[in-house]
Design a protein with these regions (language model features):
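Sec-dependent N-terminal signal peptides
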Residues: 4-13
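Short, acidic/small-residue loops that bind anionic groups at enzyme active sites
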Residues: 107-131, 139-145, 279
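ATP/NTP phosphate-donor binding region
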Residues: 17-82
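Internal helical hairpin/lid segments
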Residues: 208-265
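N-terminal small/polar loop signature for handling phosphorylated ligands or for N-terminal nucleophile
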Residues: 57-114
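ATP/nucleoside-binding phosphotransfer catalytic cores, i.e., glycine-rich phosphate-binding loops
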Residues: 251-314
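Charged helix-capping and loop-helix junction motifs
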Residues: 68-72, 106, 231-235, 261-270
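Conserved anion/nucleotide-ligand pocket segment
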Residues: 137-199
Length: 314
């Protein structure tokens, strides 16, 4: 952990060039629809990016992953160590990225000596965000995938972010809801980590566990019933070590929820917030919903409240 923290000090956001625009499309999880690739490439090029497809090699595995664990890891590591690449933009999430952690760990020394890259994605990509944040000290973007955003049509209405501007200017969001008194009265600072709750929880008690000290933990999920969410939150309460500075919850309710569903999920989160002796916040504009606001993982975040709502800045 100490080595990771030292390395993180060497790779601040200011270390990234102001005009990073060389994107490698990568996919390390569930199979993607390759008929979408021309539109994905066009969308990114219209935003001013130069796009490479050389690290996409889909031969669907028995589990429905893009390829075998070994091949997915090999392609990912090649992209991570390519000095001509600035950004790894994931085509989609799904499942299977957690399986790649042992391969990344084996190549950690080589990855540390590579030019830092910015990973962009969410959902299953959480496992890879965690590795580059904690082990390499690289910041990354929890945000829309290349196949799930406003430009692709469909349900998601979140536009593709400008990565250079995001790293230069940070983010600021109002209307973050405090879920307990500590959130209302405490000005919180820390390093933002986390992402998809299922992926974060999968590391609990393992050698890939999060170092929570001085962290603000972001959690969101989809396809989880309110009872399953209650169980996941009880697991957090039962952890032997959970010394976070704060917790931020994104969206958990279904993509097209009823008002009672929204209320039920919020009630479960509020109950947890009353049991945890840490500031807890709610911002359901991050996650698998209609909107998925970008945030910078592995980077400092501040939360402060005035009256009914709070403000998140990075």
């Amino acid at each position: 952990v100490l080595k990771a923290l030292i390395f993180a000090m060497l790779v601040p956001i200011t270390a990234f060039a102001s005009d990073i625009n060389n994107v490698a499309l990568v996919s390390s999880s569930t199979q993607f629809d390759d008929s979408q690739l021309p539109q994905i490439q066009q969308n990114l090029e219209q935003k001013g990016y130069s796009v490479s497809l050389q690290y996409l090699d889909q031969v669907i595995s028995d589990f429905g992953y893009v390829n075998t664990d070994q091949k997915r890891a090999k392609d990912l590591i090649r992209a991570l160590t390519d000095d001509n690449i600035d950004i790894l933009w994931f085509v989609r999430g799904g499942g299977g990225a957690l399986n790649l952690l042992p391969y990344l760990e084996q190549h950690k020394d080589g990855l540390k000596s590579a030019k830092p890259k910015v990973l962009v994605g969410f959902s299953d990509v959480t496992a890879l965000h965690h590795f580059v944040n904690q082990e390499l000290g690289w910041p990354s973007i929890h945000g829309v995938t290349a196949a799930t955003n406003l430009k692709m049509g469909g349900f998601n209405q979140e536009p593709l972010p400008n990565i250079s501007e995001l790293l230069k200017n940070g983010v600021e969001y109002d209307y973050v809801l405090p879920l307990n008194d500590l959130a209302k009265t405490t000005k919180v600072n820390g390093t933002l980590v986390g992402g998809n709750h299922t992926l974060v929880a999968a590391t609990f008690g393992t050698k890939y566990s999060y170092d929570f000290k001085n962290k603000v933990l972001l959690l969101e999920d989809v396809g989880v019933s309110f009872r399953q969410l209650d169980r996941l939150l009880q697991q957090i309460l039962f952890l032997n070590q959970f010394d976070v500075n704060a917790v931020i919850f994104g969206q958990y309710y279904p993509a097209d929820p009823t008002d009672p569903e929204r209320l039920m999920y919020k009630t479960v989160l509020e109950r947890f917030a009353q049991q945890l002796n840490k500031p807890v916040y709610y911002f359901p504009f991050i996650g698998h919903g209609k909107y998925n606001r970008p945030v910078i993982l592995g980077h400092s975040v501040e939360l402060s409240c005035k009256e009914e709502y709070c403000n998140l800045t990075q």
